[in-house]
Amino acid sequence: LQLTDVFREAVAPYAALEDLYDMEPDAGLGNGGLGRLAACFMDSLASLDYPAMGYTIRYDYGLFKQKVVDGWQTEIPDNWLPGGEVWMVQRQDSAVTVRMGGKVDYIWRDGHMLPVYKDCDEIIAMPYEMIISGYGDGASVLRMWSAKSNRVFDMKSFSTGDYARVMQMQNEAELISKVLYPSDDHAEGKTLRLKQQYFLVSASLQNILADHMRRWKDIRRLPELAAIHINDTHPALCVPELMRLLMDEHGLGWDEAWDIVTKTMAYTNHTVMAEALEEWDQSRVKMLLPRVYDITLEIDKRHNQHLRSKYPGDENKIKTSAILYYNKVRMANLAIVGSHAVNGVSALHSDIIKNTIFHDFYLDTPEKFTNVTNGIAYRRWLCQSNPELSARIADLIGDKFVKHAEELDKLCKFAKDKSVLEKLGEIKLTKKKQFADYVYKKSGLVIDPSSRFDVQAKRIHEYKRQLL
């Protein structure tokens, strides 16, 4: 908004603006590669004046704060909401219900098969909104879902002293939005993660369709007026869930619903390691999401029929491309089958997925595959993070680069300009001194600003390769 200097002057009699920045916690919504990319999407879409809505879970506790004590990792809860929720507005009128568990029976009525849900757990998804400002006057909306129990408080049991059971019933639903990335090295953790994924997907799609119907009245125009981005496989249940909503709630037949789904969804893949592609036990999905599992079963059956028709006798195509295989639900395969566009995040990455892990998909539908190289929101990581450097760049090439990154190419002509390089070196040293002051304030360590800093802003984990 270009108001930093105005606010710095306004608060100067009372505090330094940087001290106020330090008081505001980072939103505990995911700060790894996926979270960073999603945040940059929101900034870019807002700056380019595209109408956009991002969806996430409103976690009570974000990714744990990590300390190393005597060589061992110590995890501390990231209680970010006190201080962080000041930017949020609750939208109680847009709350939706998400159903899990139970069983589904089917009845035929007027030539249509209708699901009948029995003994389901109903969870209220309560939305909160945060406005994401772009450069200038553009803005996007981030909608966050908080899980609330739909069960009526059992006053009778509470009055008879059965407090633990009453509170357990209330708390089970609310666990869904309690912690970002709960541990999944045990069965309960795996189930909770699957609940989180479906909770996010179902609540968000219900909201998207309700918004679409309020504005446009015709569900068949959805692909024309909306695009849904599956950012890695965590939201891949979008595919069967949108099918469920279109068929069960809007009365469409399978073929018409599938046409809408595949024209609306787009999937970004983030890993080239086959062993890292997300899978769920079929039994877990069937138990927790019986209707979604049945739809996934039908999607898989029809996709396999297509492959057998196109490649008769080549069962290896089924082995690599089936959604359900060896008692697993393969989420990347589900996302690819249900999307009209599939991209990697760099030219090399996109080539690898076409030639290795998704090669059979590429042979079948090469028109789906494309590349979208990941960038960064440099207004955040250059202009805001380093205003001195940003101001110097503006002196050299003008300020159009703030909205047009290609303008930065004009800096190449200064590559051997000694005076320019000296000035850039001075700015770099200033920032290193500021960082040294920060390290001293936070840890008591004194570091030499003239030394070389090799920094990896990642949590400590063996696959992050800090030992390199």
Residue ranges of each PLM-predicted region?
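A conserved ligand/cofactor-binding region detector
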Residues: 1-468
